[in-house]
């Protein structure tokens, strides 16, 4: 299995073969994680540092669990109490960490490009856990694995991505990945949240959700990212749900076996009807969480192999 990358900074750097290699390896970890003994030693002797400059629950927990199940020594750095809060630059922090000789750095940062900058200053492997509006590669990979397992393939599907696309690194990474795998993508949302430049990705853009959902195989809902908005993007949450919230009536326009996805955390009654989110016959939201651990285990193993081959 060939994977010739030192870091995982974005989906843009990956070929379709790279994507398939990660997903195929992740499949083996799905099986491992369902066993009573969920342990491997492929990262034994390696140190993983998780640096989250933005608050996170599920992503940080997923990376921590992935590292521990692979046998790594895992450390979570509290960025709220870090030297950066005292005025230290990101580059100084990177150089300080580099002097400690970690093997894997998992980084989330509110500014686009910050993780790439940090990766240029360290000797270890760096995994991007989300940077600003830029990318969230492991989320796109876990979404891809979820789709492949549910639909039996990851190509030539009609996939709708709905909601706050303007502020979403998840949308951008999924657009790139799903495009590389030759799927047909539709972007659905109000013009304020689906900028025209996203059509450059080869996607069809709809501001009418009912029209956009016709005959799709996958419906991927996105969270309204109010923390990245400065007002005026939507008239009200009630009006937004009426036009762009996923309910059973709107889902009825998709294919009968269409699956429902959401990267979380969800705003029930705003982006998606709560009972639909919990419907095990349509929703694969819990499967996405499960696939996240397996995908991150696979990505870290592939990067660790390259680390060891380089020494």
From Swiss-Prot:
Keywords: Pyrimidine biosynthesis, Transferase. L-aspartate binds at residues 86, 169, 223. It comes from the Bacteria. InterPro entries: Asp/Orn_carbamoyltranf_P-bd (IPR006132), Asp/Orn_carbamoylTrfase (IPR006130), Asp/Orn_carbamoylTrfase_sf (IPR036901), Asp_carbamoyltransf (IPR002082), Asp_carbamoyltransf_Asp/Orn-bd (IPR006131). Heterododecamer (2C3:3R2) of six catalytic PyrB chains organized as two trimers (C3), and six regulatory PyrI chains organized as three dimers (R2). Belongs to the aspartate/ornithine carbamoyltransferase superfamily. ATCase family. This is Aspartate carbamoyltransferase catalytic subunit. It comes from Ruegeria pomeroyi (strain ATCC 700808 / DSM 15171 / DSS-3) (Silicibacter pomeroyi).
